[in-house]
Amino acid sequence: VLILSIPLLEKAKADWNSSELSRIRVSTATGLDSLPSEKATSSGTSINYIINAFGIGYTTSTLTIDDSDVKVKKTSSVLDLSVMTGIQSFTFQAGYGWLLSHKWDHPSYDTTTNSSEGGSGFFNVGVDLGLFELTGGYRVWSILHNVNLSRIKSNGRTQTSDNKGHLAYKEMYLGLGYTFF
């Protein structure tokens, strides 16, 4: 069935703009482009569903900062909305992800996110490979946060502090898409 559908899909693609076909894209973060003063790595995944040039998706990213033998993980999730256009075998997608959640995992402190706002802007480029599509993209994160850190000291007292700040970093993504009607 797959072999028989390829010529039909190619005929349909010749009649339509490549951005007007429905597709599902899954991407993973492949590198971090920021935070020069800190040792940091990032990991993340993104899934998008695009129909008639409009997309909706979900992206999560974990930034791990290695600061003097303490690894702090900062995880953010966003709801993506995007638009897509294309020419011949290439597609271009741009969008913004609204922050759904932001939390920290600290080895020495209990953490509670008091407030967070922001999100991430992104763009992706796709290359048509028939039924599949190879994608690459760039995402810029910008999050304002207020995180409460607390721990019990050796004397039994609880030590708390608020960490207010702006988290900004950039990631590169690679992925694969599946095109259908």
For each feature predicted by the language model, list its residue ranges.
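Outer-membrane beta-barrel "beta-signal"
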Residues: 129, 140, 166-181
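Flexible, solvent-exposed loop segments that connect beta-strands
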Residues: 27-41, 59-77, 100-117, 144-167
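Short glycine/proline- and aromatic-enriched beta-strand/turn motifs that initiate or cap beta-hairpins
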Residues: 11-68, 171, 177-181
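A mature extracytoplasmic/lumenal domain signature
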Residues: 60, 96-98, 138-140
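Hydrophobic, lipid-facing positions within transmembrane beta-strands of outer-membrane proteins
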Residues: 24, 41-47, 52, 77-81, ...
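Surface-exposed, polar helix/loop patches in the mature regions of secreted/periplasmic/lumenal proteins
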Residues: 86-122, 129
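Classical Sec-dependent N-terminal signal peptides that target proteins to the secretory pathway
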Residues: 1-15
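Short loop/turn motifs that connect adjacent beta-strands in outer-membrane beta-barrel proteins
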Residues: 12-20, 49-50, 83-92, 127-136, ...
